[in-house]
Design a protein with these regions (language model features):
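Short beta-strand-centered aromatic/proline hotspots
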Residues: 49-59
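Short, solvent-exposed secondary-structure boundary/capping segments
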Residues: 59-71
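Generic domain-boundary/flexible-linker signal
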Residues: 52, 64, 103-106
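Loop/turn positions that initiate beta-strands
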Residues: 37-41
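Compositionally biased, charged N-terminal/linker segments
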Residues: 1-35, 68-101, 107-119, 125-128, ...
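Short, charged beta-turn/beta-strand-edge "cap" motif at the junction between a beta-strand
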Residues: 30, 42-51
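A generic structural signal for short, solvent-exposed coil/turn residues
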Residues: 45-47, 62, 84
Length: 193
């Protein structure tokens, strides 16, 4: 999962993340429904690995979201990028229209926030962006939420001397054996229920 100020927002105003505690997204994000309690996650800032953990909780809430769109009447798509130095400030990736002010639209979305601070293990800078991309199941993907090849990722961490981080994560991942009140199957460590 990509976090931080360099996270591509495209047609929206961004997300509130604190990489070592929680990750935020909504129902407009590709793979939005694929994060669950018990999932192992690796979080990076598009430059380097920040850390790994296990999802402890996923909160859901309805919200109004401001979406930014291309103002070209023939386009109206959300694939816009804000430029840091060039003017006009925005460019549409779909129709190449350049503009200073995007069209805004309000949409009701489901917001999600996953908590993962209990097992957070900082591995800041241990793997660079190119190395992480090669460890994804779809190496060319540009999505913020991507599936990792976990055995390959674990091997890469172990080759850097961070094998203890993988063991810590393995110890925190629950076995899915009984139904909790939220219909998520969880076994509490040490056999308590």
């Amino acid at each position: 999962m990509a976090a931080g100020d360099d996270r591509q927002h495209g047609g929206n105003t961004g997300y509130d993340d604190q990489a070592d505690v929680y990750y935020s997204w909504d129902s407009t994000v590709n793979n939005y429904s694929n994060i669950h309690v018990g999932d192992t996650v690796a979080i990076w800032d598009k430059q380097r690995l920040l850390g790994v953990s296990v999802v402890e909780e996923v909160e859901e809430s309805a919200a109004e979201k401001v979406l930014l769109r291309c103002p070209n009447p023939a386009c109206g798509r959300s694939g816009i990028k804000q430029r840091k130095t060039k003017s006009p400030r925005f460019r549409c990736q779909d129709c190449a229209w350049e503009f200073d002010q995007p069209k805004t639209q309000i949409e009701t979305v489901t917001e999600y926030r996953s908590r993962h601070d209990a097992a957070w293990t900082s591995l800041e800078g241990l793997l660079r962006a190119a190395e992480l991309r090669e460890l994804c199941k779809s190496t060319k993907s540009q999505l913020s939420m991507r599936e990792l090849d976990w055995p390959a990722f674990a091997a890469a961490l172990e080759s850097t001397g961070a094998g203890r981080a993988i063991q810590r994560i393995r110890n925190r991942v629950p076995d899915f054996q009984f139904m909790s009140t939220d219909s998520i199957q969880v076994t509490i460590p040490s056999g308590h229920s």
